[in-house]
């Protein structure tokens, strides 16, 4: 049973899931919004909101924490210098998920996740 389990496995091993969330987070930071499956979007929302909350302080520890998760210099810099300051007075709720369509190939529910 999966009672009170904290995250979705997304049908992947732990390393694959970690790499997937890292790459989706980098894409969201770079483009501002992306269209993916609903369950991936919900997992990404949790992942990215923790990073934005950590990046809001903007100090060296924040840089190191965010870089440890993203491992991408340009995404880390953009998150800390451009994105996080916009949410300085906001306590959570930095992203929005909107369900869009059913994917043609497998009728999977798609969603757009975007930075508010």
Swiss-Prot record:
GO terms for cellular component: cytosolic large ribosomal subunit
InterPro entries, alphabetized: Ribosomal_bL17, Ribosomal_bL17_sf
Domain of life, source organism: Bacteria
Stored SUPFAM superfamilies: Prokaryotic ribosomal protein L17
Gene Ontology biological process terms, A to Z: translation
One Pfam assignment: Ribosomal_L17
Coiled-coil residue windows: none
Keyword annotations: Ribonucleoprotein, Ribosomal protein
Alphabetized GO MF terms: structural constituent of ribosome
Family, per entry: Belongs to the bacterial ribosomal protein bL17 family.
Assembly, per entry: Part of the 50S ribosomal subunit. Contacts protein L32.
The protein's name: Large ribosomal subunit protein bL17
Origin species: Helicobacter hepaticus (strain ATCC 51449 / 3B1)
Gene: rplQ
């Amino acid at each position: 049973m999966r009672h009170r389990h904290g995250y979705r496995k997304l049908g992947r091993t732990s390393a694959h899931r970690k790499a997937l969330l890292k790459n989706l987070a980098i894409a969201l930071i770079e483009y501002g919004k992306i269209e993916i499956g609903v369950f991936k979007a919900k997992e990404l929302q949790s992942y990215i909101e923790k990073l934005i909350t950590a990046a809001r302080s903007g100090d060296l520890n924040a840089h190191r924490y965010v870089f440890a998760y993203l491992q991408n210099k340009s995404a880390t810099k953009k998150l800390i210098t451009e994105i996080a300051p916009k949410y300085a007075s906001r306590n959570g709720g930095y992203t929005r998920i909107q369900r869009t369509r059913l994917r043609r190939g497998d009728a999977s529910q798609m969603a757009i996740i975007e930075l508010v």
